[in-house]
Amino acid sequence: MNGYGSPYLYMGGPVSQPPRAPLQRTPKCARCRNHGVLSWLKGHKRYCRFKDCTCEKCILIIERQRVMAAQVALRRQQANESLESLIPDSLRALPGPPPPGDAAATAATASQSSPASQASQPPAPPRPTAELAAAAALRWVAEPQPGTLPAQLAKPDLTEERVGDSSSTDNTAEAFSDKDTDQRSSPDVVKSKNCFTPESPEIVSVDEGGYAVQKNGGNPESCPDSPKYHAEQSHLLIEGPSGTVSLPFSLKANRPPLEVLKKIFPNQKPTVLELILKGCGGDLVSAVEVLLSSRSSAAGAERTAEESLVLPSSGHIFEHTLGSYPISSSKWSVGSAFRVPDTLRFSADSSNVVPNPLAVPLQHPFPQPPRYPLMLRNTLARNQSSPFLPNDVTLWNTMTLQQQYQLRSQYVSPFPSNSTSVFRSSPVLSSRTTEDPRISIPDDGCPIVTKQSIYTEDDYDERSDSSDSRILNTSS
């Protein structure tokens, strides 16, 4: 078949070719690739012959590296700020603890020596991170707490961020994270490090981020002569990259992240917090960022809604219905006959009719709060003295015109009797008036009128069903 509708035939290979397994991509040197040389990237950076090249492509690579470094630094800073936001302001002014190494040495020697011998002993070298973590694990086995280990394992990204910030060089950061992961993966390390007993009143544990943490025991006379002794008995002392902070035991990082979220956001429902935490993969920092960003976006939406709507004097009636529907949005198109155009705003000034034509004073509030916003139909009646009749102002509820009769008596005409030319020069309304076959429902005290439609029947031909894509045909 040579017709245009026939499928193409590719004769290069067999039709039923088995799929090959994708090979793992080996990273190459981008600078060498710019100059037509293929070089493996591992161990090549120091010996690259194009490392000092200043051509346009290599300069572009340098700029990309700067952007990536800036992004990493920004993420670390945001992680630090979110961690600091978990700490109450009343605890930030407390005096700081000693350095982590000295604290580790003090706590290690406190349970084995007397205060007199402790004052004469030189400080022991700080214990490695794996040993401290093993001690913390022994403590956890002796006193199990609900959700402590899942909270620790669920936040590896946070651990890497804290470790990367607290370490002086990248090498120490890698050593911290490697030792931490080795301690988590292999239980032999925990079994071999049995130098601490679970009954020890003072123990040095390692926080999730690799900070050395000193827990002061319940015995105040354990080391009174030591300069490293701290008076705070009920606080967790943390040495961080941005300064020294002191946390109560109720807010330490061993708690489940859901409990921390409940303490930070008491107004949120626990089910909502649990769903957000699951969506973030158990990462506490990501969940806090999501909740803070949602709160800021909600505040911004309320601010824009207040700017776009000038509510009347009885604005409490409209706040729960119109606050979430900003009229200035692009979806309030002129092409829909059942929507308010962008030029129409609510105003508390009923005398200034022409620039703000929809000033609707209310006689008394609604009998029940409606669930949908108030839609005002901009149709013209035969009686030009009052363009908006009471039966034109309807509340569109779940069933159309359900509450029309019980709400009709609550509206009055928004225009005085002398406002005959409000919509005559409006670009929304067509100058051609055709009779609408629909007949209005008679009402007590209201004349029987026939409504005029904005569009003719020809305007509805070849038109999309989507209300957002309707365009007013001004050819008529």
UniProtKB/Swiss-Prot annotation:
<protein>
    <recommendedName>
        <fullName>Doublesex- and mab-3-related transcription factor 3</fullName>
    </recommendedName>
</protein>
<keyword id="KW-0539">Nucleus</keyword>
<dbReference type="InterPro" id="IPR009060">
    <property type="entry name" value="UBA-like_sf"/>
</dbReference>
<dbReference type="GO" id="GO:1990837">
    <property type="term" value="F:sequence-specific double-stranded DNA binding"/>
</dbReference>
<dbReference type="GO" id="GO:0046872">
    <property type="term" value="F:metal ion binding"/>
</dbReference>
<keyword id="KW-0805">Transcription regulation</keyword>
<keyword id="KW-0726">Sexual differentiation</keyword>
<dbReference type="GO" id="GO:0046661">
    <property type="term" value="P:male sex differentiation"/>
</dbReference>
<feature type="compositionally biased region" description="Polar residues">
    <location>
        <begin position="165"/>
        <end position="174"/>
    </location>
</feature>
<dbReference type="GO" id="GO:0019226">
    <property type="term" value="P:transmission of nerve impulse"/>
</dbReference>
<dbReference type="Pfam" id="PF00751">
    <property type="entry name" value="DM"/>
</dbReference>
<keyword id="KW-0221">Differentiation</keyword>
<dbReference type="InterPro" id="IPR005173">
    <property type="entry name" value="DMA"/>
</dbReference>
<comment type="similarity">
    <text>Belongs to the DMRT family.</text>
</comment>
<dbReference type="InterPro" id="IPR036407">
    <property type="entry name" value="DM_DNA-bd_sf"/>
</dbReference>
<keyword id="KW-0238">DNA-binding</keyword>
<keyword id="KW-0217">Developmental protein</keyword>
<feature type="region of interest" description="Disordered">
    <location>
        <begin position="147"/>
        <end position="195"/>
    </location>
</feature>
<feature type="compositionally biased region" description="Low complexity">
    <location>
        <begin position="102"/>
        <end position="121"/>
    </location>
</feature>
<keyword id="KW-0479">Metal-binding</keyword>
<feature type="DNA-binding region" description="DM">
    <location>
        <begin position="29"/>
        <end position="76"/>
    </location>
</feature>
<dbReference type="InterPro" id="IPR001275">
    <property type="entry name" value="DM_DNA-bd"/>
</dbReference>
<keyword id="KW-0804">Transcription</keyword>
<feature type="compositionally biased region" description="Basic and acidic residues">
    <location>
        <begin position="176"/>
        <end position="185"/>
    </location>
</feature>
<feature type="domain" description="DMA">
    <location>
        <begin position="255"/>
        <end position="290"/>
    </location>
</feature>
<feature type="compositionally biased region" description="Polar residues">
    <location>
        <begin position="418"/>
        <end position="432"/>
    </location>
</feature>
<dbReference type="InterPro" id="IPR026607">
    <property type="entry name" value="DMRT"/>
</dbReference>
<comment type="function">
    <text>Probable transcription factor that plays a role in configuring the spinal circuits controlling stride in vertebrates. Involved in neuronal specification within specific subdivision of spinal cord neurons and in the development of a coordinated locomotor network controlling limb movements. May regulate transcription during sexual development.</text>
</comment>
<keyword id="KW-0862">Zinc</keyword>
<dbReference type="GO" id="GO:0007628">
    <property type="term" value="P:adult walking behavior"/>
</dbReference>
<dbReference type="GO" id="GO:0042487">
    <property type="term" value="P:regulation of odontogenesis of dentin-containing tooth"/>
</dbReference>
<feature type="region of interest" description="Disordered">
    <location>
        <begin position="89"/>
        <end position="130"/>
    </location>
</feature>
<dbReference type="GO" id="GO:0006355">
    <property type="term" value="P:regulation of DNA-templated transcription"/>
</dbReference>
<dbReference type="GO" id="GO:0021521">
    <property type="term" value="P:ventral spinal cord interneuron specification"/>
</dbReference>
<feature type="region of interest" description="Disordered">
    <location>
        <begin position="418"/>
        <end position="476"/>
    </location>
</feature>
<dbReference type="GO" id="GO:0043565">
    <property type="term" value="F:sequence-specific DNA binding"/>
</dbReference>
<dbReference type="Pfam" id="PF03474">
    <property type="entry name" value="DMA"/>
</dbReference>
<dbReference type="GO" id="GO:0005634">
    <property type="term" value="C:nucleus"/>
</dbReference>
